[in-house]
């Protein structure tokens, strides 16, 4: 199995640069601060099943908080970013582990037992709230929630990658190459779409919810479906082509 490596070199410089870009964007759009919310867990209708959590990419730009729903980051020009790190005292679900110093040292970390611990942050100033959690829509005025001009500026800034981001992309490409090679071997062995997908995930130690995109694993005529989402568990008798 491919070993996943944690990229730490250059992270402090990355956060400093992200802070600089946010400060410029906030000043240009007339905001005093920004509150970036990770997002919340969503439950399916009339069920107790929670959809896999996907963190707000604007927060992921700052810190590796892939599984940290209901955390939030307060960004003010000239100040250390304040991270409300949601870590509930829970026995029903496994809460996030304590923050690791290699990244947490760049923030003022506020440990939070309640999901709305951030609520009073930035209330007496012009604050932009960034995220799609239901709690934001309920508690924040529409003019402050996801201001499009500010988001457009940040989108543009994110197109220019820091050295840290480039290193992370290189690591992702390395893992992707391992997984693609494992999938190709599965195809040549005559495995089904489902089995090829499992081979892909096992080769790099990931589960579906951790993949950056829903895997398209298509054999034969399924290649023609642009975003083919099924994974047949029975391999065709005659396997002619493979799309990953």
What are the language-model segments listed below?
Residues 8, 12, 159, 186-190, ...:
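Hydrophobic alpha-helical scaffolding
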Residues 60, 152-158, 185, 214-215, ...:
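Flexible, active-site-adjacent loop/turn segments at secondary-structure boundaries
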Residues 161-213:
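Active-site pocket-lining segments that scaffold enzyme catalytic pockets across diverse folds
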Residues 1-178:
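A composition/biophysics-driven feature that prefers long, compositionally simple stretches
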Residues 47-54, 191-244:
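Short catalytic-site patches enriched in acidic/histidine residues
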């Amino acid at each position: 199995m491919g070993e996943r490596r944690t990229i730490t070199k250059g992270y402090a410089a990355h956060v400093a640069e992200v802070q600089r870009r946010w400060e410029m964007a906030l000043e240009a759009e007339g905001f005093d601060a920004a509150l970036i919310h990770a997002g919340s867990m969503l439950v399916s209708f009339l069920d107790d099943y929670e959809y896999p959590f996907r963190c707000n990419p604007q927060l992921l730009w700052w810190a590796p908080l892939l599984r940290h729903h209901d955390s939030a980051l307060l960004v003010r020009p000239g100040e250390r970013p304040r991270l409300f790190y949601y870590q509930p005292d829970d026995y029903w679900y496994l809460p996030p582990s304590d923050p690791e110093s290699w990244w947490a040292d760049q923030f003022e970390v506020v440990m939070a037992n309640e999901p709305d611990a951030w609520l009073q942050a930035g209330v007496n100033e012009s604050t932009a709230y960034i995220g799609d959690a239901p709690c934001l829509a309920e508690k924040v005025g529409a003019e402050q929630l996801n201001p499009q001009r500010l988001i457009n500026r940040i989108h543009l800034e994110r197109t220019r990658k820091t050295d840290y981001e480039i290193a992370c992309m290189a690591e992702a490409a390395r893992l992707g190459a391992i997984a693609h090679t494992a999938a190709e071997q599965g195809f040549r062995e005559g495995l089904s779409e489902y089995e090829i997908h499992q081979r892909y995930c096992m080769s790099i130690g990931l589960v579906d919810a951790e993949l950056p995109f829903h895997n398209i694993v298509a054999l034969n005529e399924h290649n023609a479906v642009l975003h083919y989402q099924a994974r047949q568990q029975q391999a065709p008798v005659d396997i002619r082509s493979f799309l990953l």
